Amino acid sequence: MKHLKVALSDSVQSKIKSIAGRTCVGVFETDFTDVGAVVIDDGELDLVNNNQISSFGIPIIVLRLDASRDISLYENRITSIIELLSMSIDDCTSEIEKVVANYEASILPPFFRALSDYVGDENSQFDCPGHQGGQFFYKHPTGRAFYNFFGENIFRADLCNADVKLGDLLIHEGYAYDAQAHAAKVYNADKTYFVLNGTSSANKVVLNALLTPGDIILYDRNNHKSICHGGLVMSGATPIYLETARNPFGSIGGILDHCFDESYIRQLVAEKSPEKANAKRPIRLAVIQLGTYDGTIYNARQVVDKIGHLCDYIFFDSAWVGYEQFIPMMKDCSPLLLELDPNDPGILVTQSVHKQQAGFSQTSQIHKKDSHIKGQERYVDHKRFNNSFMMHASTSPFYPLFASLDVNAKIHEGELGQTLWRECVEVAIDARKAVLKQCKYLRPLVPPIVHGKPWKEGNTHEMACDVKYFAFEPEAKWHSFNGYGEGQYFIDPCKFQLITPGINVETGEYEEFGIPANILANYLRENRIIPEKCDLNTILFLMTPAESKYKMDALVAELVRFEELIDLDVPMEEVLPSIYYGHIDKYKGYHIRQLCQEMHDFYKSRNVSLLQQRLFSREYFPDYVMNPQEANFEFQRNKGELVPLSEAEGRIALEGALPYPPGVICVQPGERWSKTACDYFLALEDGINQLPGFTPEIQGVYITEQSNGYKQAYGYVLKKEY
């Protein structure tokens, strides 16, 4: 299939009207992402120096009209010279088409290229899927609307593996293998596996490949629920939980520095599995969130140096990053750029490509970097690993998902990948500067002073290359995370997080007035701006190379407008009309500051900020009573009962309980419901009843409406009499 156009200069357009059925555009009518060649004449050589053309490696074709013109200075940048005076137009366009076709073949990665060609063959289908290239949909008005909405190619590319031309996605052969091998090269992995049902499944592939009952898993308490499901519930491993930081604003921080001390870890192992405490490598697998949802980034080299000798493998769940190796100042946090030897742990990395990279939703990838331990007993070879992969992979894959992973790797290949992310970081820096300059209530989570001057006065280009502008200085008040070590963490520059007022920066205590982030998030949604998530007094926006200055300026303008509405104390119905009219019995007559005050006072009266911090502090961890796998078995055996959370304290949880987002389990299966956990979830219950329209999503806890209209929270616990 011919995807690319040909860009022609004004002079050339007067001579060439069409090229082998391709669309022709003027050189000033394109951003060069959709053209396969630029054609100019020998009097327009200044275009050879166009940075956009050179950055994409687009062929430049020069038509010779005047043999006396000296073009020697430009020859190293010119792909082809056509002597128009001695050739027919047909021969000329044929030469141009050859160049374009070669370029087109070079930019399409292996699987996507094969898929495009296969779709172009227009085969007569008698295999799955039953819609047969969309034709079934076309036989009904509803189906036709569905087909027209998505367009022809998405249906024609939805293929069956009955035809093996595209390779096998389960045993990794043919073009499917080529695509994954190419991605491994781009990401510096030994082997890469494309996963089509999300990083929740990718994580389970990794965990089920490595862990068995009785194995020790060093468990970052920030881990996504899928780590519990795959590592604890399905594999039956024994968890050693590491406490993590939360700041008073609600941001998710990293593992405390002292948790990486060898003697401390061995002490924790001794509590659960005394016979393994003194083993050379007591830990089968450590699972670390390389980057938290809110953008606390680990130094991977530091992690491996501190605990690597205790672990067979370290698994970095990189769902919320994956682009770090394309941003030079972040390279120390990339596990895949580490130099490793036989004494180091094997490295496994999962990445949610769909989150901030260029993949369709549900696309994920697993990177395996463990050739340095090949031959050792702890090594997991491809065949054993792929056995786990096939347990979780569908035998009916959606080929466009796989193709998007292939294309993502191609986009990140070479210098262009770094260029895209550098531009993204610079856009994000400028947006933070704009908030600092234009907003009076909101502030970005960045150090106030760097290199002796205010953060906003730094040079954007230099800041994008200097991690000091994003470093978490231990115990600094501006971030209020406690327990960090020197150089341990920094802020992901691509997580644009803002802090709303209401928490005193110096003390971490609630102030008299505040603006909970949930109110700002709903205001933005009312105005068609969709943030990623919010927590108590934080709101998060994800930055990708898709962002532009125009888009960020529009966001900042809406933030400024929100602050103006707060100052004017306008009626709530003007700020949040959907919530106001959806719950008018509650909010009739409210002004926006009244809503802010009521919600702020609600959180303050229950000290939710402190409860949230305690949930992830070892001192307040729920008691570990039962292995999570056994707790789940009891749940399956119907040995649980559903009780109000007001009566759950001290009872053994049979399900993980968590708010979503962020998907981090607060009470693990097999733990006793603690007072802290009960108080936290009961505060959420109260909020659902007292502040309708701002209901959070909670999993593992069931909200049931009572006869009096009160919505009460329940959880499954082990039956007392059992």
Predicted segments with their positions:
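Short active-site oxyanion
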Residues: 3-5, 190-192, 214-217
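Conserved PLP-enzyme active-site core in the AAT-like
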Residues: 8-10, 22-30, 41-57, 64-66, ...
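A short linear hydrophobic-aromatic micro-motif
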Residues: 192-193, 350, 528-532
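Short strand->helix junction
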Residues: 200, 293-294, 548
